[in-house]
Regions:
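Beta-strand-rich recognition domains
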Residues: 713-718
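Accessory carbohydrate-recognition regions in carbohydrate-active enzymes
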Residues: 20-387, 391-437, 441-493, 501, ...
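Bacterial Sec-dependent N-terminal signal peptides
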Residues: 1-21
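Extracellular attachment/recognition segments
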Residues: 725
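ATP-dependent phospho-/nucleotidyl transfer catalytic cores
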Residues: 498
Length: 768
């Protein structure tokens, strides 16, 4: 630990000599690790393939043949309130509401060898260990904890494709490292299809794991290297049955045999160590082969200097964090801001070897020509604000992400763009075809300027795939019938928005016929609006409304992760038409006001796993993405000022320091991206548009250091906790008379000034 503190100090001084503040000091990876945040605290670098993090439990997905709801708490492998650690695995999702991964769990132990993980109720029954938050520390590219049962200090760091462990054994006798190839996140009974491992020499182990589940066919290869020779090794197989044993019976495969294969394997490696001696291990992963994993290790971690690897990781984070420099009202705001940037830059993740090879959707090996391939596209979440944020702060990476989506499309047998894809698999989670939105947003904002016909063709083909999720009925009837496909209202509304995004892309490219076709489809939201009730509601295939409608209920009403009160406001591409449809300004503002002030009793979301009380203000469900644009809809009314105090309220209520600081799943950075945009004072209500809706900033000042070399500054004059209302906005010294700025205003550099007051200016942006 002393070495890390010294290294961090040296790194800070190095940054200081470059007149750069060490912004990584404001990041707290523990934020979101309790309750519903589903973030992990471990070591990773920006967009890294490896997320080396502790798992506090690896509970089964089913108990007695039925879904175990407790498994939902472990989407990221770690729960802050747990008292034991099972081990440290190398792949994790950040903030998701469903899960996978948890590959290649390693656990250092000492004393009598145990190969079962045991239980939290009885830690002594297995190899897990008790731990205390008093002896745990998380920071960008670094995690440290003391395993109390073994008195082993564990330090973790990472490069893009390699996880690096440093273990300090207080007692070197009987030192073991367990490699659990059975462990994982969302442990289905038959999740492991096959595992294979071989000892190449006394310091190098290679192998792979193939799993099924959320990703139906997922294969990950590894190379594990130690800085000290293995004294002896062994394994235990837990396969219930063996398809073929044959002539393997002539060997004792369980001890010092150099290769082992099976569905359920745990291995161990013993070392001769002195008391207080350190052991370093490097685990490289590859989607291609063990040879690829070895190349990744050789390229990214050729030596054994843990501190240097750690410092390089900190430097990589500082480089990304310096894309925005902020002054804030209070120190905790700076912690929340840079932690949000950290979470936003965790994914999508690099998916390919250092030589550019990767496993494609067709399970073949492909070469990424001229781009870095990415995976883990949680698109139902991230199209809203994360990818638009990338168009501002990470355009080069977002360009590669679009190329990765198009590669997915080219390899798809359907063919379709990704819906929710990870590790060369389409898992079909959630709804919509929001790749179209991400691509359209990148095209209209000119992040992507090449291969445009290909991009448009991919989006159109995806949107015309009749057998996917009610699209056939949607194209035929202009809505998705509830008795054809569930969550039908949400699907209709989101398809209509995606269609609008396709129309914008077609218009940008100059394809008038496609633009007209999809602009017409974009009006399908009107077909699920019930004038009598004033809500969007589910309709049946015969054209009648589904009976038993309750606009407060989040379950069984045709919506996903929301209710009619929230989802009726989901027409981000046509807010003015939606307002007119709902009865005009006065009635619409009443609806918005009521949404934030009314009560949503627990019974209305008791059957919806992804919604919790922590993410709700009144009836506004911020912990779930469909409502993220809602507070900005005041901008299309004559009372734009009403968004100002509510934005500040959401920023304060849903984003706090501490492990339980997030009001819902971070959803691969979408919740964090909302915070970043809103703290800066503007938000992309409709990705695919070049406009951002103005709000009320939380920062005192922010400088955006853009990739094109320009800087864009946000200034909030008279900013304070009390002064949350905007009385005037100026762009480059000129007063704005509409509550919008354009993407080009940001990218060409300039200054956006908000004049803050303690009372609202009710005439701001007035239409009169």
């Amino acid at each position: 630990m002393k070495k890390i503190l010294l290294t961090s100090l040296m790194g800070f001084l190095a940054w200081g000599t470059q007149a750069q503040e060490d912004l990584s000091q404001y990041v707290d990876p523990m934020i979101g690790t309790a309750k519903m945040g589903h973030t992990y605290p471990g070591a990773t670098v920006p967009f890294g393939s490896v997320q080396l993090s502790p798992d506090t439990d690896t509970i089964p997905y089913e108990v007695n043949g039925r879904y175990n709801p407790e498994v939902y708490r472990y989407c990221a492998g770690y729960q802050y309130d747990d008292a034991t650690i099972v081990g440290f695995s190398h792949t994790h999702f950040s903030g998701t509401g469903h899960s996978d991964l948890g590959d290649f769990l390693m656990m250092p132990t000492s004393g009598p060898l145990q190969l079962n993980p045991g239980t939290e109720a009885d830690p002594d029954s297995g190899y897990r260990s008790r731990f205390s938050h008093d002896r745990e520390h998380a920071a960008p590219a670094y995690y440290q904890v003391t395993l109390d049962d073994y008195d082993i200090d564990v330090e973790l760091t990472a490069t893009t494709r390699v996880g690096v462990h440093r273990y300090t054994f207080a007692q070197g006798e009987d030192a073991h490292v367990i490699l659990d190839l059975m462990a994982g996140i969302y442990n289905y009974d038959d999740k492991n299809v096959w595992t294979f491992m071989r000892e190449e020499n006394d310091t190098l182990v290679t192998g792979f794991r193939e799993t099924t589940g959320w990703a139906r066919t997922r294969k990950v290869f590894f190379a594990l290297s130690f800085d000290k020779p293995i004294k002896q090794y062994g394994n235990r197989k837990y396969d219930e049955k063996q398809a073929y044993r044959g002539f393997w019976g002539r060997f004792n495969e369980s001890e010092n045999f150099p290769e082992i294969a099976g569905r359920k394997i745990r291995a161990y490696f013993d070392f001769d160590l002195e008391d207080g001696e350190q052991l370093i291990a490097k685990m490289a992963i590859s989607p291609v082969s063990t040879a690829g994993a070895i190349k990744n290790m050789q390229a990214e971690t050729p030596g054994w200097d843990f501190d240097a690897i750690h410092q390089a990781g900190v430097d990589s984070w500082n480089k990304e964090l310096h894309k925005v420099q902020v002054k804030t009202i209070q120190e905790s705001d700076k912690v929340n801001f840079y932690t949000a940037m950290y979470h936003a830059f965790l994914g999508p993740t690099v998916y390919g070897d250092v030589d550019g090879r990767y496993r494609g959707l067709d399970m073949n090996i492909h070469q990424a020509e001229g781009f870095t391939n990415y995976t883990s596209f949680s698109l139902w979440d991230t199209y809203r604000a994360l990818h638009p944020l990338f168009n501002v702060l990470q355009p080069a990476r977002n360009r590669d992400m679009v190329k990765s989506m198009l590669a997915h499309y080219d390899q798809s047998v359907h063919p379709m763009l990704p819906i929710w894809s990870h590790y060369a698999n389409e898992n079909w989670c959630m709804i919509g075809y929001h790749s179209a939105s991400v691509i359209a947003d990148a095209v209209v904002k000119e992040t992507v300027t090449a291969d445009l016909a290909h991009a448009l063709d991919a989006a159109v083909t995806t949107a015309q795939t009749a057998y996917f999720d009610g699209i056939g009925a949607y194209m035929e009837k202009g809505y998705v019938p509830e008795d054809v496909s569930g969550a039908s209202v949400s699907k209709t509304l989101e398809y209509a928005y995606d269609d609008w995004a396709i129309a914008q892309m077609a218009d940008k490219i100059g394809n008038a016929s496609i633009s007209r076709e999809f602009a017409a489809r974009a009006e399908n939201y009107k077909n699920v609006y019930d004038q009598q009730t004033g809500f969007m509601r589910p309709k049946l295939k015969d054209g009648s409304w589904k009976q038993g409608f309750d606009p407060l209920d989040t379950h069984g009403q045709g919506f996903i992760e929301g209710n009619a009160w929230n989802y009726s406001l989901y027409v981000p591409h046509a807010p003015q038409e939606m307002i007119n449809m709902m009865g005009g300004d006065h009635r619409f503002v009443e609806h918005l006001d009521s949404l934030f002030s009314m009560d949503l009793p627990d019974r209305y979301f008791a059957n919806t796993e992804d919604i919790s009380r922590e993410g709700i203000i009144g009836n506004y469900v911020h912990g779930n993405e469909p409502s993220h644009h809602v507070v900005y809809l005041y901008n299309w009314t004559d009372q734009a000022w009403k968004s100002h105090d509510k934005i500040r309220m959401i920023l304060r209520a849903m984003y706090q320091t501490g492990a339980d600081g997030l009001g819902g799943n971070d959803d691969f950075g979408q919740m964090s991206a909302w915070y970043l945009f809103s703290a800066l004072g503007f938000y992309p209500v409709a990705p695919g548009s070049v406009e951002y809706a103005l709000g009320s900033p939380l920062v005192e000042e922010a400088t955006l250091n853009l990739e094109n070399g320009k800087t864009f500054t946000v200034e909030a004059q008279n900013q304070s906790e009390k002064n949350q209302y905007v009385s005037k906005v100026l762009l480059n010294g000129e007063e704005l008379h509409e509550p919008f700025i354009r993407h080009a205003d940001i990218m060409k550099g300039g200054k956006l000034t908000f004049i803050m007051k303690g009372r609202p200016n009710k005439k701001i942006f007035s239409k009169d």
